[in-house]
Amino acid sequence: MSDILSETRSRMKKSIESLSRELATINAGRANSNLLAGVKVDYYGAPTPVQQLASINVPEPRLLVVSPYDKTSLSDIERAINAANLGVNPSSDGEVIRIMVPALTEERRKELVKDVKKMGENAKVSIRNIRRDSNDDLKKDEKEGVISEDELRTGTDDVQKITDESIKEVDKVLEEKEKDIMSV
């Protein structure tokens, strides 16, 4: 039974981490190197993350500077950033790529908050599915005589506690991101 509980906790933690990674790519009106986290560059035929091909600096609150390690990859990186539809317009001077992060309009902020809530809801659904799987495993163990009926009840209560904690954590992560987006 403790195996089921530890796996439940681990899977729910992964769902929360996945949500955090997904939220990190959302532009909240400030430059952040995570903005380019999902951008893959076609580098010698292989899709390669920008972070492996260039250093990404934030010299000003709304400016990203991408300095390729290999200057020949500059145009490929610029093309990949354009293709990623991040709502930014990269400009190159032959040495580095500068990306001005535009200020968000109120309408765009509300749109982003809606997207964030949708991502959060997906994470909660994932957590509830994990709860269902864990409860099914516990019921199967009880049917097979591995655990008693009392242990089943205790186990399902523990799974519910882990679920509640995980959903609270998701709510906290969402609240922080919404506050970040709505702050001007």
Curated annotation (Swiss-Prot):
Keywords: Cytoplasm, Protein biosynthesis. Transmembrane segments: none annotated. One of its GO terms (cellular component) is cytoplasm. Gene3D superfamilies: 3.30.1360.40, Ribosome-recycling factor (1.10.132.20). The keyword Cytoplasm applies. It comes from the Bacteria. SUPFAM superfamilies: Ribosome recycling factor, RRF (SSF55194). It is found in: Cytoplasm. One of its GO terms (biological process) is translational termination. The keyword Cell inner membrane does not apply. GO terms for molecular function: ribosomal large subunit binding. Pfam families: RRF. Belongs to the RRF family. Responsible for the release of ribosomes from messenger RNA at the termination of protein biosynthesis. May increase the efficiency of translation by recycling ribosomes from one round of translation to another. NCBIfam families: frr. This is Ribosome-recycling factor. The gene is frr.
